[in-house]
Amino acid sequence: MDFSNSLFNLSKIEDSDNDTYRNSDCLSERFKKISKTRSIKWSSESDLTKMCSYDVAVETMRRNSLEEVSQCMQDRLNAGTENILETGEVSDENSLKKKTFLMNMFRTAVLKVMTDPSGNDVEGMYVRSLRFGMWYLQR
C-alpha cells in the first residue's frame, strides 16, 4: 500500500453530515476558526475526525499497523531532511534541527492518537502537533 498517496493526496472528504469539502476549502475554514480562538479543546474523538480531511487521515492511520505508520513517518522525515539539504532551503544547522524536531513531535502525536484514541487524551499538545504536522507535510 502506498501510504503517502492514500493519506496525503485526498481531494475530497465527505463528513458525517454528507457535506463534501475540498482540502483547500477546509484549510481556509480551519485557519478562520483557529484565528478566532487561541485554544481549541476537543470534547471527543469524533470532534477531531469530523473537522476535515487532515483529521480523517487520523482514521486512515488507525487502520494501519503502528509499525507501518511509524515507518512511513520516519521515511517522510528522512526524505524531508534530504530534500532540505539538497535544495538549501535551510540556511543553518539549527533550522534543520528545528524542522527535524517538529517532524518527530508530529510522529509522536500520530502514535499517541493511534494508541490512545479515547478523546479525553487526544487534546492539547498532541492535537496541535498533529494538525501542524499534517499541514507541514503537505507544504
Swiss-Prot record:
Domain of life: Eukaryota
UniProt-recorded name of the protein: Uncharacterized protein F15G9.2
Upper lineage: Eukaryota, Metazoa, Ecdysozoa, Nematoda, Chromadorea
